[in-house]
Swiss-Prot record:
One example GO MF annotation: RNA binding
Entry GO terms, CC: chloroplast
Source organism per UniProt: Fagus hayatae
The gene coding this protein: matK
Biological processes annotated in GO: mRNA processing; RNA splicing; tRNA processing
Tagged with keyword Chloroplast: yes
Family according to the record: Belongs to the intron maturase 2 family. MatK subfamily.
Name used for this protein in its record: Maturase K
Length: 504
């Protein structure tokens, strides 16, 4: 952000919220590829290699204006020849510029809102694992969850209208309309299952910004309703720096939505309602009765259709009882289980037994979906039998071993919060034997002969990685390490879901 402020201070257009001229500043595209900036935005750095030259950008924008999009039919939308042979490369260049520039006013506004406010900015809240301690604390006391699939697709104009309320540069928005045409005809919806996958992979940063801007409208309603119904006003939410920049937003939402919601229905006034969004879905957990949860369900459908003009269907919202249903959440299976215990109590000469059955959130590794991910990645077959990785047979022995160990270590790291860690032994076994078969195939040998040659140390390296990592953090006592390894450990440095754990 300091880079942005240094570049933008001498620019006169900053005073008038003009973003369009920034598209012709080459340092914008250099910043998009910078190591530090991309690490902050959680995207993989691909290096700045002068492909984003100012001349290329000017030519692309000129051709966008000269192209007649009214002549494109629905059948020709997939054969858009505007970008020619290097369509993916050039569209990525433009989308990176769009994404970097449109984030500037939001980031500057956010930083200015924190000035003078004594707020601790916690970057640890970026971790995926930071949500699980919250769920462990809250879900056992609730009864029902509403699994909501956020409605798709959405028309292009709705995205533009969402940005128009916050971005004042008409030229920038006009060019953005032209750019979005290459992904979908203006007369159809923007996102189908196939097109959203292509768009998000080729333009991840731009897609995330458009997606979050769109979803933020829904979450604004939840924030407003929650603030109105809760006795404890949401005034300390500014610590969620990377999530929604909620601080100093509450008063604005109260003014905006007060006219739309002059009377809050009684069934919405629930101080025990909790909301979590992930991977195009969201969870509403509550202590309400099934009748009130059904009212919530149809209220959400009407809200989307009437207030946001997005088509939805009640079938996209499922109400489940926590005690009978498992949540497929961030690659984990989570369910609320009873943990019965019997305590003998004695008062004077009388003794009696007290049966206690507190609820506990049980978080386990989904073995079958995880094996399916390994099979899709060609580490094993559909039955879970390890196979050799052909694409890595041309690497050196050290590189092959190091890559398999890194995959195994990352999975162990990601699933460290599981209450049943022994289930990970099967996954480690598949990766270990796949590594052995890959090396044996490279050396034109059998897996048994190769294992006999390298010895048992090779086997143990896959299974002791997590324990060795914990020994670097805590005192090296066998009791402490054994207790930590068997218990749940949530790490605050996991900022994206593991590729093999993503079963979507």
């Amino acid at each position: 952000m300091e880079e942005f402020q240094r570049y933008l201070e001498p620019d006169r257009f900053r005073q008038h919220d003009f973003l369009y001229p920034l598209l012709f500043r080459e340092y914008i595209y250099a910043l998009a590829h910078d190591h530090g900036f991309n690490s902050y935005m959680l995207l993989e750095n691909i290096g700045y290699d002068n492909k984003s030259s100012l001349l290329i950008v000017k030519r692309l924008i000129t051709r966008m204006y000269q192209h007649n999009y009214l002549m494109i039919s629905a059948n020709d939308s997939n054969q858009n020849q505007f970008f020619g042979y290097n369509k993916n490369l050039h569209s990525q260049i433009i989308s990176e510029g769009f994404a970097v520039i449109v984030e500037i006013p939001f980031s500057l506004r956010l930083i200015s809102s924190f000035e003078g406010a004594e707020i601790v900015i916690s970057y640890k809240l970026r971790s995926i694992h930071s949500i699980f301690p919250f769920l462990e604390d809250k879900l056992p006391h609730l009864n029902y969850t509403t699994d909501v699939r956020i409605p798709y697709p959405i028309h292009l104009e709705i995205l533009i209208q969402t940005l128009r309320s916050r971005v004042k540069d008409a030229s920038y928005l006009h060019l953005l309309r032209f750019f979005l045409h290459q992904y979908s005809n203006w007369n159809i919806l923007i996102i189908t299952t196939k097109s959203i996958s292509i768009f998000s992979k080729s333009n991840p940063r731009f897609f995330l910004f458009l997606y979050n801007s769109h979803i933020c409208q829904y979450e604004s309603i939840f924030l407003f309703l929650g603030n109105q119904s809760s006795h404890l006003r949401i005034i300390s939410s500014g610590v969620l720096f990377e999530r929604l920049y909620l601080h100093k937003k509450i008063e604005h939402f109260a003014e905006v939505f007060a006219n739309d919601f002059p009377v809050i229905p009684c069934f919405l006034k629930d101080p025990f309602m909790h909301y979590v969004r992930y991977q195009g879905k969201s969870i509403l957990a509550s202590k309400d009765t099934p009748l009130l949860m059904n009212k919530w369900k149809y209220y959400l459908v009407n809200l989307w259709q009437c207030h946001f003009y997005v088509w939805s269907h009640p079938g996209r919202i499922h109400i489940n009882q926590l005690s009978k249903h498992s949540l497929d959440f961030w690659g984990y299976f989570s369910s609320v289980q009873l943990n019965p215990s019997v305590v003998r109590s004695q008062m004077l000469e009388n003794s009696f037994l007290i049966n206690n059955a507190p609820k506990k959130l049980d978080i386990i590794v989904p073995i079958i979906p995880l094996i399916g991910s390994l099979a899709k990645a060609r580490f094993c077959n559909a039955l879970g039998h390890p196979i050799s990785k052909l694409t890595r047979a041309d690497l050196s022995d050290f590189e092959i071993l190091n890559r398999f160990l890194r995959i195994c270590r990352n999975l162990s790291h990601y699933y460290s919060g599981s209450s049943k860690k022994k289930s990970m032994y099967r996954i480690k076994y598949i990766l270990r034997l796949s590594c052995v078969k890959t090396l044996a195939r490279k050396h034109k040998s059998t897996a048994r002969a190769f294992l006999k040659k390298v010895g048992s140390e090779f086997v143990q390296e896959f299974f002791t990685e997590e324990e060795e990592f914990l020994s670097l953090i805590f005192p090296r006592t066998s009791f402490t390490l054994r207790r930590l390894y068997r218990g749940r450990v949530w790490y605050l440095d996991i900022i994206f879901i593991n590729g093999l754990a993503n079963h979507e």
